[in-house]
Amino acid sequence: IMMLGDKSIKPEEKLTRVYPQKNLFSHIIGQIDDDNNGIAGLEKSLDEQLKKNKDKIQLTVDKDIQFLIREELIKYNQIFRSNGSAAILMDVNNGEIISLVSIPDFDPNLRTNITDKNYINRVTKGVYEFGSVFKTFTLAAAFHEDIIEPQTQFNNLEKKLKCGKNTISEYDEKIPSDLSAEQILIRSGNIGSVRIGQSL
């Protein structure tokens, strides 16, 4: 077009981001606006560094693990017909994030076709009831206070327990009535967790 010599046509340089992995790291990488300013994810938190520094930025995420976890989430999203799901995998020895996946995700190369719900990072911005995840904190507090040890035994645990105005029951009737603290955590025992919580 420029070879036509039409003076009304002027070239304009514009930087464009290209994301070869498409959806795979979308919520980690985040987004930019029309002027290439970071507005979410690493694009936002490392905005200045990305603009000034031409060197590569090394992340701790593993591409293969990220792929496998994403595939599993997509599969079970379809099986359970859920609105979305999320997973995070961290190395507990050093805090490095090995994988962070939020479904639905998006292809940052095709931002014009993305709905708002796809932009939500369910790992960092999702709001959830604690549910059984909180059992970890209950047991950790009891260990910290030297109230229990992993092998502390809890016998004759009921299948239902009245807690204030609420009745708490086991999600699985097959959970034994005699469990160690370790087994309560492994089997996600509701009654045993309440008993430990009451001892704090």
Where are these regions (language model features)?
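Small/polar-residue-rich segments within soluble enzyme cores
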Residues: 1-55, 59
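Short coil/turn connectors at secondary-structure junctions
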Residues: 7, 24, 96, 149-150
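Basic, glycine-enriched DNA-binding surface that flanks or lies within the catalytic cores of DNA
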Residues: 14, 90, 98-101
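Short, solvent-exposed loop/turn and secondary-structure capping segments
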Residues: 22, 98-102, 110, 151
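Short beta->alpha transition motifs characteristic of CBS
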Residues: 30-35, 99-105
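Short, flexible micro-motifs
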Residues: 33, 41-44, 102, 134, ...
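Generic domain-boundary/flexible-linker signal
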Residues: 39, 98, 106-108, 195
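Active-site loop and adjoining helix of the penicillin-binding protein/serine DD-peptidase-beta-lactamase fold
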Residues: 53-93, 108-200
